[in-house]
Amino acid sequence: MDVETKIKKMGLGHEQGFGAPCLKCKEKCEGFELHFWRKICRNCKCGQEEHDILLSNEEDRKVGRLFEDTKYSTLIAKLKSDGIPMYKRNVMILTNPVPAKKNVSINTVTYEWAPPVQNQALARQYMQMLPKEKQPVAGSEGAQYRKKQLAKQLPAHDQDPTKCHELSPKEVKEMEQFVKKYKNEALGVGDVKLPREVVDQGPNQMYIPGGDRSTSAAVGAMENKSHEHRRTHYACYCCKMNMKEGDPAIYAERAGYDKLWHPACFVCSICYELLVDMIYFWKNEKLYCGRHYCDSEKPRCAGCDELIFSNEYTQAENQNWHLKHFCCFDCDNVLAGEIYVMVNDKPVCKPCYVKNHAVVCQGCHNAIDPEVQRVTYNNFSWHASTECFLCSCCSKCLIGQKFMPVEGMVFCSVKCKKMMS
């Protein structure tokens, strides 16, 4: 597919998940409606991952595309209908042991994902070593956690130009080169093994200086001794705690045979969340989720959440922005050269701030302009003026004076307070 065709196919899938309820805002949100370039709901401003959207096939396509043209292509299957790679995630159904009684239904547990190992007992152990609220049991809090992390850690717009907003042909080409590079140099999938299996399959790094045929017996003895030592001492690369020989460990090929992790310790070094489906990115001796690996390589637009491939972009409030995306979070008007106020780390233009976010003066009951000085005590505010910050009894100006606050009112003295009580 050429660049021009890819640009024509670009779209954010606005019909996807339309009307889905927000898990965070509940009934306050009218239902999911994707903003035309931000990756958030237009109604409640929460992200797509905060909504109860059925995305199983879409997520499997996304991960399938990630593994395409990599050594992990065995984890995908291409549909005959459209040739789109689909992630063959391993679903595990476990039957819990129950006493042999008549008329007793079999109790089964379905995991929406499980490590693809032949030893089901090892997979069961792996799941039990995860925090219960993060075990991806179908219909549980853990399954919702996995779904949210798939969206957060592996954004489709970090690998697919057609999921981005109005990229130029040059930006599409740069993005494709970037994706190819991280697939070749950083992408990996963890493997669940027993600690001794990982260490035993690693290359023997022991070196005996001056060795010859006459020392073969001694070398063999030393190798055996070293082998025994390695089989009884295993430490987690993350927490540094000892690992039990019979417990499952995670091995990451790009990290090397000398590094192992507890299942609950196989986390991103930035957000410290479990690496979803054990998909990791390795850089500078650290594990990253897809999002934070990309953040370490490219600036990310705080407006649209996409990586920036343009040479020109804006930096403001310790964040990066596409030139066209440095906009008011409420009305989307461009803020270049305009006065704005940061509200929850989002820029808001002055009119929207006064209308939607400004605190109300207890004196005149009008919104307080962001550029105007004010007096604040607990949850109450006043214009810092002789007309507003006054004694609620005698109207004496209290600027620079001691005062007594009582339920939104202020008094200059005990006498005035008693007169109003």
Swiss-Prot record:
Keyword presence, Ribosomal protein: no
InterPro entries on file: LIM1_Testin, LIM2_Testin, LIM3_Testin, PET_domain, PET_testin, Pk/Esn/Tes, Znf_LIM
Domain of life of the organism encoding this protein: Eukaryota
Chief location category: cytoplasm
Compartments, as annotated in UniProt: Cytoplasm; Cell junction, Focal adhesion
Cellular component per GO, a single term: cytoplasm
Keywords annotated in UniProt: Cell junction, Cytoplasm, LIM domain, Metal-binding, Repeat, Zinc
CDD domains from the UniProt entry: LIM1_Testin, LIM2_Testin, LIM3_Testin, PET_testin
Domain remark text: The N-terminal and the C-terminal halves of the protein can associate with each other, thereby hindering interactions with ZYX.
Domain LIM zinc-binding: 234-297, 299-359, 362-421
Stated role: Scaffold protein that may play a role in cell adhesion, cell spreading and in the reorganization of the actin cytoskeleton. Plays a role in the regulation of cell proliferation. May act as a tumor suppressor.
Pfam families attached to this UniProt entry: LIM, PET
Gene: TES
Quaternary structure, from the entry: Interacts via LIM domain 1 with ZYX. Interacts (via LIM domain 3) with ENAH and VASP. Interacts with ALKBH4, talin, actin, alpha-actinin, GRIP1 and PXN. Interacts (via LIM domain 2) with ACTL7A (via N-terminus). Heterodimer with ACTL7A; the heterodimer interacts with ENAH to form a heterotrimer.
Keyword Repeat belongs to the record: yes
Similarity comment: family membership: Belongs to the prickle / espinas / testin family.
Any Gene Ontology biological process: negative regulation of cell population proliferation
Residue ranges annotated for the PET domain, each copy included: 92-199
Protein name: Testin
Annotated GO MF terms: zinc ion binding
